[in-house]
C-alpha cells in the first residue's frame, strides 16, 4: 500500500472510532438525563398521604369523692410522715411556718401551711410570732418534705386558711386583711372564684385544716367575733369554688374555733376548739342541706389544752380550766370517740390518741 492510501486508511479508522465514541458519549448523556427525569418525576408525583396528628395529653382522672361511707373501724394509729423541717432548716432553706395540715386528693397528699414570709435562721425570721401579718401566705408541698422555696407551691395570701379536693380540683380558702374587715378568698384550680366578707368585723377566721367534700360539694366552718366570748359561726357549702349556701349556727353559750372536719356516711362532722370556757371540745354535725346538730363531747377524757385531769364528762362546756385552748380533733364512732390531745394538761407538748367507748 502506497503511503497516501495508508494515511487515508488510518485517518478513516480514527474518524470512525471518534464518531462511535461521540455517539457513545451522546447516548450516555441521554441515559443520565432520562434517569434524572424519572427520579425528579417520582419526587414530584402527587400521592395521597395520611397526615393526621394525634395530640396526646396526660389524662388526669377526675372522680366524685362521695364521702358516703362510715368511718372505718380501727384499733390503733400509726405515724404517716415527718418532715424534720427544723433540723433540715439549720443548714437548708426552710420556711418559718405554723398551722400545717395535710389534705389529700384521690391522686396525692399535700402538706398545707401558713408561712411567715421568711426562712429559718434568716434575718427576716425575727419577730415572726404574730398570728396575723401581711407577709403570711398559704402554701403547700408534697407530704413528708420540709417546706422550702424549691418544693412549695403558692396557694393564697392568708393568715387563716383551709383547703380540700373535690375529686376534680383543689379548693383553697385564704383569709387576710385588717381585723375589722378581713376577706376570705376562694380559689378553685388556682383561679379566684368567690369571696366571703367578714360579717361581724371581728377577725374572720376558719379551720386551719382541711375542709370536707361530699358528692362534689365542699364544706367549711368560719368564726367571726370574740375569742373569749360569744361569737358568730357559719357553715358554708361550696361547689366548684363558689358559695352556694350558708347558715349561721344558733349556738348560745357555744364557742367554735379552728374546726377539724371529716365526712361520715354522707354527712360532715366537725370537732372544734372552745377558746372561751370549755376544756372539752364542741362539735357540729350537718347534712348536705346544712341541717345541723350541735353539742360538746361528753367524754370524761378531756381533749383541749389546758384541761383538768380526766374525770366525769359533761355534754356542755366543761368550765374547769376551760379558758384558752388549742386546735385539735376527735372522731366520733358509734357510741364512742377517738380523742386526739396533748399529753400535757397545761402545755402544748406531746400527743396521744385515746379511745373512749362511752
Swiss-Prot record:
Which residues take part in binding Ca(2+)? 274, 278, 304
What happens to this protein after translation, modification-wise?
Answer: N-glycosylated.
Q: Which residues bind substrate?
A: 98, 132, 257-258, 273, 348
Q: Where is this region: Head of neuraminidase?
A: 71-358
The enzyme's main class, written as a single word, is: hydrolase
GO BP terms: carbohydrate metabolic process
Q: Which UniProt keywords are given for this protein, alphabetically ordered?
A: Calcium, Disulfide bond, Glycoprotein, Glycosidase, Host cell membrane, Host membrane, Hydrolase, Membrane, Metal-binding, Signal-anchor, Transmembrane, Transmembrane helix, Virion
Q: Any known activators or inhibitors?
A: Inhibited by the neuraminidase inhibitors zanamivir (Relenza) and oseltamivir (Tamiflu). These drugs interfere with the release of progeny virus from infected cells and are effective against all influenza strains. Resistance to neuraminidase inhibitors is quite rare.
Q: Which reaction does it catalyse?
A: Hydrolysis of alpha-(2->3)-, alpha-(2->6)-, alpha-(2->8)- glycosidic linkages of terminal sialic acid residues in oligosaccharides, glycoproteins, glycolipids, colominic acid and synthetic substrates
TM segment ranges: 7-27
Question: What is the required cofactor set for this protein?
Answer: Ca(2+)
Name the cystine pairs: 104-109, 164-211, 213-218, 259-272, 261-270, 298-315
Q: Which terms does the record give in the GO molecular function aspect?
A: exo-alpha-sialidase activity; metal ion binding
A cellular component term from Gene Ontology for this protein is: host cell plasma membrane
Record's bilayer topology term: Single-pass type II membrane protein
Q: Where is this region: Hypervariable stalk region?
A: 36-70
The UniProt record's further free-text remark is:
The influenza A genome consist of 8 RNA segments. Genetic variation of hemagglutinin and/or neuraminidase genes results in the emergence of new influenza strains. The mechanism of variation can be the result of point mutations or the result of genetic reassortment between segments of two different strains.
State the family named in the UniProt similarity comment for this chain: Belongs to the glycosyl hydrolase 34 family.
Q: Please give the function described in this protein's UniProt entry.
A: Catalyzes the removal of terminal sialic acid residues from viral and cellular glycoconjugates. Cleaves off the terminal sialic acids on the glycosylated HA during virus budding to facilitate virus release. Additionally helps virus spread through the circulation by further removing sialic acids from the cell surface. These cleavages prevent self-aggregation and ensure the efficient spread of the progeny virus from cell to cell. Otherwise, infection would be limited to one round of replication.
Give the multimer and partner information: Homotetramer.
Q: What is this protein called?
A: Neuraminidase
Q: Which organism is it from?
A: Influenza A virus (strain A/Guinea fowl/Hong Kong/38/2002 H5N1 genotype X0)
Q: Show the taxonomic lineage.
A: Viruses, Riboviria, Orthornavirae, Negarnaviricota, Polyploviricotina
Name of the gene: NA
Amino acid at each position: 500500500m502506497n503511503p497516501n492510501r495508508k494515511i487515508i486508511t488510518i485517518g478513516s479508522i480514527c474518524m470512525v472510532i471518534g464518531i462511535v465514541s461521540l455517539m457513545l458519549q451522546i447516548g450516555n448523556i441521554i441515559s443520565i438525563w432520562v434517569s434524572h427525569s424519572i427520579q425528579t418525576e417520582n419526587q414530584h408525583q402527587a400521592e395521597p398521604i395520611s397526615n393526621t396528628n394525634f395530640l396526646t395529653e396526660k389524662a388526669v382522672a377526675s372522680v366524685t369523692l362521695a364521702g358516703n361511707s362510715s368511718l372505718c373501724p380501727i384499733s390503733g394509729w400509726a405515724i404517716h410522715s415527718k418532715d424534720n423541717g427544723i433540723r433540715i432548716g439549720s443548714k437548708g432553706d426552710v420556711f418559718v411556718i405554723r398551722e400545717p395540715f395535710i389534705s389529700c386528693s384521690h391522686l396525692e397528699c399535700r402538706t398545707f401551711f401558713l408561712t411567715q414570709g421568711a426562712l429559718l435562721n434568716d434575718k427576716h425570721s425575727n419577730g415572726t410570732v404574730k398570728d396575723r401579718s401581711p407577709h403570711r401566705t398559704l402554701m403547700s408541698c408534697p407530704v413528708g418534705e420540709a417546706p422550702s422555696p424549691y418544693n412549695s407551691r403558692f396557694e393564697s395570701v392568708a393568715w387563716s386558711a383551709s383547703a380540700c379536693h373535690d375529686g376534680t380540683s383543689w379548693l383553697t380558702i385564704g383569709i387576710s386583711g385588717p381585723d375589722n374587715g378581713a376577706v376570705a378568698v376562694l380559689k378553685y384550680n388556682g383561679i379566684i372564684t368567690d369571696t366571703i366578707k367578714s360579717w361581724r368585723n371581728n377577725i374572720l377566721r376558719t379551720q386551719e385544716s382541711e375542709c370536707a367534700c361530699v358528692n362534689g360539694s365542699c364544706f367549711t366552718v368560719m368564726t367571726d367575733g370574740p375569742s373569749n366570748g360569744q361569737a358568730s359561726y357559719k357553715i358554708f357549702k361550696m361547689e366548684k369554688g363558689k358559695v352556694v349556701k350558708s347558715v349561721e349556727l344558733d349556738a348560745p353559750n357555744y364557742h367554735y374555733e379552728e374546726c377539724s372536719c371529716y365526712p361520715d356516711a354522707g354527712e360532715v362532722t366537725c370537732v372544734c376548739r372552745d377558746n372561751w370556757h370549755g376544756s372539752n371540745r364542741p362539735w357540729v354535725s350537718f347534712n348536705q342541706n346544712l341541717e345541723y346538730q350541735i353539742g360538746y363531747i361528753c367524754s370524761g377524757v378531756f381533749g383541749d389544752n389546758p384541761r383538768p385531769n380526766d374525770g366525769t364528762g359533761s355534754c356542755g362546756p366543761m368550765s374547769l380550766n376551760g379558758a384558752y385552748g388549742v386546735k385539735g380533733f376527735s372522731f366520733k364512732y358509734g357510741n364512742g370517740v377517738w380523742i386526739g390531745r396533748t399529753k400535757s394538761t397545761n402545755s402544748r407538748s406531746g400527743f396521744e390518741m385515746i379511745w373512749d367507748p362511752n
